[in-house]
């Protein structure tokens, strides 16, 4: 499978989300470059808003929704990073975010979703339970 980046689509996504995200640094390490035998670059998305690297994709997806879809809100299942990112993106758009989280999710991730106004439904910590619960929530 071959993947070609769609530069115009990337630029459109950037224009859509740029006011809602941090411009995070790219760091380098001479020591690691030497060990790897090549130049390495580390994009520090851990410094992103909501503290999660999935903020860019969540914002882009939520901001792309048409008005009818947006009114219904968004639903996902996640134990953490995507949950927080989607709850934040939905809050920015002013739409509901319904987040299915396994009962064993870290408290810090639960608190992040709640802080962004996401409505959490807990389920058993299995993929099947998460998917079934998300379908019910829709």
Sequence positions of predicted segments:
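PLP-dependent amino-acid enzyme catalytic core
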Residues: 1-138
């Amino acid at each position: 499978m071959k993947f070609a980046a769609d530069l115009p689509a990337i630029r459109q996504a950037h224009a859509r989300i740029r006011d809602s995200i941090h411009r995070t640094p790219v760091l380098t390490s001479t020591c690691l470059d030497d060990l790897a035998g090549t130049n390495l670059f580390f994009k520090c998305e851990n410094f992103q808003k909501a503290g999660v690297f999935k903020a860019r994709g969540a914002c882009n997806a939520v901001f792309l929704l048409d008005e009818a879809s947006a009114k219904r809100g968004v639903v996902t299942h996640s134990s953490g990073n995507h949950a927080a990112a989607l709850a934040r993106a939905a809050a920015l758009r002013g739409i509901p975010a319904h987040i299915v989280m396994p009962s064993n999710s870290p408290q810090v991730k639960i608190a992040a979703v709640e802080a962004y106004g996401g409505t959490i439904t807990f389920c058993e910590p299995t993929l099947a339970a998460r998917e079934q619960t998300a379908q019910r929530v829709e």
